[in-house]
Amino acid sequence: MKYFIPIMLLLLTSFTTRENADLVIYNAKIYTVSDKMDIAEAMAVKNGKILAIGRNSDIKSHFEAVSVIDLKGKAVFPGFIDSHCHFFKYACMTKAMSNLKGSLSFSEVLKLLKVYHEKYRPTWLCGRGWDQNEWKPKNFPDNIELDKLYPHKPVMLIRVDGHAVLVNSEAIRRAGITEKNIKNPNEAIYNTKGQFTGVFLESAADVFKDLVPQQDRQHQQTLLLEAEKECFSMGLTSLGDAGLDKGSVLLLDSLLVTGALKMRINVMLDPTEENFKTFVAKGPVHKDRITIRSIKVYADGALGSRGACMLESYQDQPGNKGIMDVSVEKLRSICKLAYDHGFQVCTHAIGDSANRMVLKTYSEFLKGKNDLRWRIEHAQVVAKADVPLFGMYSIIPSVQATHATSDMYWVNERLGPLRSKDAYAYHELMMQNAWIPNGTDFPIEEINPLFTFYAAVSRQDQKGFPRGGFQPENALSREQALRSITIWAAKAAFEENAKGSLEAGKLADFVVLDSDIMTIPLSNVPQVKVFMTYSGGEAVFIR
């Protein structure tokens, strides 16, 4: 790491008078995240881009600006990038539901639901965030109590991972699903009499989500703006929004083009015929704040709901290997479409069976080293023999470090010691291509990218558990973790030439923190606060 880089503007020495800038910051510790990880003191910004970056004396002597800010030694970083999240669904679904996260029993879920119902009286009573792995015993709930409390109102409670729902009998009636006509019987949980308990997984769960009435456009816009404020307050300036339908993309596009929204969004399209005709057939779209060049596919479910597709049965449920959500033939057809039209494929794969299938299917098209940057989202459990395929075919593992520290309490009983030892192998995966993008997968995890940074380096929860870290051999260094939420995250979306580092000519997306995450005790990182967030040289958050 080189401390205090020389000024980064080729013709700067030729100026005899000071050049106008919109913004100058100085007396800062600016982590540029350049190739050499240079550190600077000051930066000049104009028209949303970085004019120059270097020493205090150089920047102040060569530039004058309307806004000049003395940061008094505070640490500055490139705007944080969440490579994989669900921004639109968080805003327009989760924020419009009862928040069930952190509930320690089903009784607590019912209490939270009651408060929400009495306050809002919705036509559909919905909540999100329950996790039976946090309860004692760790069993899936059933809908008996829901039927007693809400016999005539449909209720849908989405599990924390989004891959399972608990619904009451009224919701099942409205969906028209019975034990005899359900398309995939493995996507429902049954009682000892062979009847639905109310828990549905994967595509069966999606049936209920689709029945919930959507907010009107104006309400959606309000919710999106609220969610954007949250993201800016966490230092996020760019997001990868994973899995959007046509209507959601068009709404985001209209709001971003008009400037109502300012977040930079990399769209991953749902693999629907409507999206293929509307977007993919016309080729990639690159605008100032929205990029459309990726297709999101689900290969399997999640570990928490035992939907992740495994090569062998779950340790705690013999005979159950999870659910494969897409056939090889279907994935192959999507890959061909993407390949032919210059689109990136981003496939959710958590179990080792799903990861193997995706890796092998990708390899049919990639044929060795390449720069197509096809991604596997999550890559949580990968068979040892399959790990080298990431490097062999330049396949990018897009991971979420907090998944490891959220799942570590129960993953051993779910997978057994051998498989769990090789799970969440982020350092090993990073080494395959020498870089790795990171994200949060919010609302499944918390939005805060500093939690991602902390989990990636410490492999611990915020209480310091376990001592020494969960599988610490797969921890990232602080520099690697920082790159994973900045320049490597930008690279995962083909945007490393525009953002992800603070260098002359790049977008002036940056965040100012109240402490230096690169030098403070690691245990203090989760308490660090964002002081200011800038997007395109504009202050979008000030504490």
Residue ranges of predicted features:
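Bacterial Sec-dependent signal peptides at the C-terminal "C-region" and cleavage site
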Residues: 3, 8-21
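Divalent metal-binding segments
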Residues: 15-26, 31, 35-278, 297-354, ...
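Short, charged, surface-exposed secondary-structure boundary motifs
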Residues: 79, 275-278, 407-411, 448, ...
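Non-cysteine beta-strand/loop elements that form the S-adenosyl-L-methionine
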Residues: 86, 290-307, 394-404
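Acidic (Asp/Glu)-rich catalytic clusters
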Residues: 255-259, 281-290, 369, 390-392
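Substrate-binding cleft/loops of secretory-pathway carbohydrate-active enzymes
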Residues: 274-285, 399
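His/Asp/Glu-enriched, well-ordered alpha-helical/loop segment
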Residues: 335-346, 353-374, 378, 384-388, ...
